[in-house]
């Protein structure tokens, strides 16, 4: 498998992967956008990688992070907000080697840039994502509550 930067030619496949990817059991967030890259453009410094089968060209997954300067207890740190990690349900079952290589590829690139840690958000009902993150060495450090107000 090849880990490489995502390119505009990947857009259609990445949107399809996003639409099929599991999000948990109770809440499904729907984000209708015309380009998979629109979220990455919200940040000034992003890394967006895909895992590509070198024999078939099929995309096995995607990982994305934004490098950010953060102030933690009065000290400036360089962190990376991981805002996407998805496997292609048409190509993968469970935690595959492809997702491992993608995660490691992101880590390597972030360490080269001097990033001290990676952080992200996982919905509490998304047990598969929790499992993947824990297998990769992540640990839960806090909790956020989001509230919605219906408008009708």
Give the predicted meaning of each segment:
Residues 75-137:
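Acyl-donor binding region in acyl/amide transferases
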Residues 1, 56-62, 80:
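Glycine-rich phosphate/pyrophosphate-binding loop shared by adenosine-nucleotide-utilizing enzymes
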Residues 49, 83, 141-142:
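Core nucleotidyl-transferase/polymerase catalytic module
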Residues 21, 51-54, 149-151:
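Preference for well-ordered, secondary-structure-rich cores of eukaryotic proteins
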Residues 70, 121, 139-152:
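Conserved catalytic-core motifs of GNAT/GCN5-like acyltransferases
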Residues 1-37, 42-44, 81:
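Short amphipathic alpha-helix that is part of the acyltransferase structural core
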Residues 36-54, 61:
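A short helix-loop-beta-strand connector motif used in the catalytic cores of GNAT acetyltransferases and
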């Amino acid at each position: 498998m090849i880990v490489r930067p995502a390119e505009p030619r990947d857009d259609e496949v990445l949107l399809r992967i996003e639409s099929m990817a599991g999000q948990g059991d109770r809440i499904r967030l729907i984000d209708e956008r015309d380009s998979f890259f629109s979220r990455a453009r919200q940040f000034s410094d992003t890394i967006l990688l895909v895992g590509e089968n070198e024999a078939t060209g099929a995309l096995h997954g995607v990982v994305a992070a934004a490098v950010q300067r953060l102030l933690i207890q009065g000290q400036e740190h360089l962190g990376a907000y991981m805002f996407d990690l998805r496997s292609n349900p048409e190509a993968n079952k469970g935690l595959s080697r492809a997702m491992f290589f993608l995660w490691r590829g992101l880590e390597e690139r972030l360490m080269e840039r001097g990033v001290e840690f990676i952080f992200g958000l996982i919905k509490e009902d998304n047990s598969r994502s929790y499992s993947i993150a824990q297998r990769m060495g992540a640990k839960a450090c806090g909790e956020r509550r989001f509230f919605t107000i219906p408008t009708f």
